[in-house]
Amino acid sequence: MDNLERKIETGSLYKLDKNFLLTKVDKKYRITNGPAFIDKLNFYHTDSSKKKIYKIKINKKNKILKKTLFKKFNSAEGSPDGMTLDKNKNLWVAHYHGACISVFNKKAELLTRINFPAKNITNCAFGGRNNNELFVTTAKKGMSKAEMQKYRYS
C-alpha cells in the first residue's frame, strides 16, 4: 500500500475459479480488503481508504446483481480492513488505525467492540480446535515512537 492508492481507484475484486481462470468481478476500489462470504452468492467487501464496507450479491456467473453500502466508518473509528464471519453470520471487522475489532449483525448494528493494545488491526479469522478462537494480525506501518509505546503489541 502506498499513498497513491489512497487517491486513485486502481483496485479491483477478482475471482479465481477451479481452472485458475481469473475474472474481474468489480473495480474502482482504492484499497480493497475482505471479502467475507455470507453464503455462495452474498459477501462483504471493503474499500479501506474510503472507510466503507459493501454488501454484494452476485449471480452464478459472478456478475454483481446488487451492491449496497453496509457500513461507513468515521475517522475516529479508523478504516475497515480484514474481516470474517462467525457461525451466526455476524461480521467481525478489523479496524486499521482504530485499535479494535467491531462485531456487526446483518443490519449493520454494532453488537460489540473489542479494544486491542495495537493501533493497526489488519485482519481476523476464527480457528482453533472448535473454530471458536479469534486470530488477529497487526501492523506497525507509519507509527511514531510514542504510538509504539502506547500500542506495544503492534
Task: Give the ranges of each region predicted by the language model.
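Conserved beta-strand positions in repeat-built beta-propeller and related beta-rich domains
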Residues: M1-K7, F43-K50, L91-Y96, F135-G142
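Beta-rich, blade/repeat-based domains predominating
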Residues: M1, K7-L13, L22-F43, F73-N90, ...
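A short loop-to-beta-strand structural motif that recurs across blades of beta-propeller domains
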Residues: G11-Y14, K52-Y54, C100-S102, S154
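Short coil turn/linker residues within repeat-based beta-strand modules
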Residues: K18-F20, K50, K60, G98, ...
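Blade-level signature of beta-propeller repeat domains, shared across WD40, Kelch, NHL, RCC1
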Residues: T122-S154
